[in-house]
Regions:
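PLP-dependent amino-acid enzyme catalytic core
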Residues: 1-104
């Protein structure tokens, strides 16, 4: 069942919510095998890797799947086929400056 949590700050501001909506929660509960919590540092690392290696500028929220994979939080094998949906448009200049300090 959905649980209300304390409001958090994150570079992935599009994903921050105190409580999921009932329809969204029901869909996710039915169609997923698990969840992963991804730190801002991992989101920024994924963003930088996508920018430098893939030439893709993405918003932090869309880097969450890749951030979890880079951290080893997804049960993936080298032979698995994986798809992450990457989008842009919600990138603040401050976030781009933060990428300068991120180590790959």
């Amino acid at each position: 069942h959905p649980v209300r949590v304390e409001q958090q700050r994150s570079v992935a501001d599009a994903l921050v919510a105190q409580k999921p909506g009932d329809v969204c929660f029901a869909y996710v509960a039915k169609n997923t095998d698990g969840f992963a919590s991804v730190a801002d540092a991992d989101l920024l690392r994924a963003m930088k890797l996508l920018l430098l290696e893939g030439k893709l500028l993405c918003e932090p929220s869309s880097a969450i799947g890749m951030g979890a994979a880079l951290r080893g939080q997804l049960p993936l094998r080298r032979t698995d086929k994986v798809c992450f949906v990457i989008s842009g448009g919600n990138v603040a200049l401050e976030q781009l400056h933060q990428l300068e300090d991120v180590r790959l």
